[in-house]
Amino acid sequence: MSLPATFDLTPEDAQLLLAANTHLGARNVQVHQEPYVFNARPDGVHVINVGKTWEKLVLAARIIAAIPNPEDVVAISSRTFGQRAVLKFAAHTGATPIAGRFTPGSFTNYITRSFKEPRLVIVTDPRSDAQAIKEASYVNIPVIALTDLDSPSEFVDVAIPCNNRGKHSIGLIWYLLAREVLRLRGALVDRTQPWSIMPDLYFYRDPEEVEQQVAEEATTEEAGEEEAKEEVTEEQAEATEWAEENADNVEW
């Protein structure tokens, strides 16, 4: 698929995709994913063509931007590594997020409280989000999916080939997708200027690591306060000694 020069993959974005291991696919290749294979490593891991990934990502962004009401786009991730990315994508683009378990019947059973009638569905993994894809097929809702080389492509209308198992890869794809959607909508006018939002915001963070980091910061602050108190105490002691010496000199 040939793209206008404006949509060409920049060296900076290519470096981001490679740094996040977006190009590392599975050992097995599904028949519909064969056009996206660039090469195979000696250890059996297939390498995904990053150019194909970018082309499909731009195509998906153009589809999303064509929907007038952003809330009619539903972003889904049952996979833990993609839940933070889905929430950030929805916050920046106005889409409706479903992070966590997808309630069966959300697209087909209008009696349920979680019933929705979207015009487009985006999923992180066709396997973990199989229920959402299946229900979308029942009511003729187009589906965009982040697919690995061994992912099933049944009922998927637009497949973005990438590593959908790594937390950095998933977060980066959602980040780039959100950025391209905002550019197409005109929210980001200048394509030559970088987006003020960093990709790290879309990456999954382990709650235990966050708690440990907060605890370390608190410990560092306490240590700094203790050092400051010790310095103040030493200064007070020096001032007291100096005052006593001056008093002795005056008496003499």
UniProtKB/Swiss-Prot annotation:
Residues 209-252 are annotated as: Disordered. Coiled coil: none annotated. NCBIfam families: uS2_euk_arch. It comes from Saccharomyces cerevisiae (strain ATCC 204508 / S288c) (Baker's yeast). This is Small ribosomal subunit protein uS2A. Signal peptide: none annotated. Component of the small ribosomal subunit (SSU). Mature yeast ribosomes consist of a small (40S) and a large (60S) subunit. The 40S small subunit contains 1 molecule of ribosomal RNA (18S rRNA) and 33 different proteins (encoded by 57 genes). The large 60S subunit contains 3 rRNA molecules (25S, 5.8S and 5S rRNA) and 46 different proteins (encoded by 81 genes). The gene is RPS0A. The keyword NAD does not apply. Component of the ribosome, a large ribonucleoprotein complex responsible for the synthesis of proteins in the cell. The small ribosomal subunit (SSU) binds messenger RNAs (mRNAs) and translates the encoded message by selecting cognate aminoacyl-transfer RNA (tRNA) molecules. The large subunit (LSU) contains the ribosomal catalytic site termed the peptidyl transferase center (PTC), which catalyzes the formation of peptide bonds, thereby polymerizing the amino acids delivered by tRNAs into a polypeptide chain.
